[in-house]
Amino acid sequence: MVNLVIMRHGEAEPMSAKDSQRQLTVRGLHDVNQMALWLQQHYAAFDWVWASPYLRTRQTAELMLAKQAPFSQLEIVPELVPDGDAALFKSYFDARLSEKPDARVLLVSHMPLVSFLVEAFTLPGQAPVFNTAQLACIDYRPAQGGRLLERLSPQELALLSF
């Protein structure tokens, strides 16, 4: 059962003076919408949707919420910033999961943290590079660890949808 989806934000504007304020591009909005529709068709809705405080991750999470978790609220988690600590976040996640062990959670974050999160929740040495709007679906239990069940990018989804 997939209970954890780790997602990189959609394509954002080029680097600017204030990285945290970069917005999604038109392509980024489209890609995130496509990924949200795919998740809606393949997996149950999320109980919790968490994103970094950066604008592009909040925009991504809000689009995902609209399609995938209409009864959930977006929670901003400062530890999900690009240079966040995956091991520290995993400890936080495990503590929260103890409150609701069957919760389904979407995390929206950045490279390189999304790669390190996959590694922290699955197997050491398994830190895949993420394209924008790409997601990883994980079956995770704190006592047993996690299994990466699938990864999907907007580009791969387009090939499946031809």
Q: Predicted segment positions?
A:
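Active-site-proximal alpha-helix that buttresses catalytic centers in soluble enzyme cores
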Residues: 2-80, 84, 125
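Beta-strand elements within well-structured catalytic alpha/beta cores of enzymes
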Residues: 3-7, 103-109
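Short, well-ordered beta-to-alpha junction loops that form the rim of enzyme active sites
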Residues: 53-54, 109-112
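Short phosphate-binding loop-to-helix
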Residues: 81-97
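A polyampholytic, Gly/Pro-enriched intrinsically disordered region
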Residues: 92-106, 148-158
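Non-DNA-binding regulatory cores of transcription-related proteins
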Residues: 96-101, 111-134
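Domain-level recognition of soluble alpha/beta enzyme cores
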Residues: 122-149, 154-157
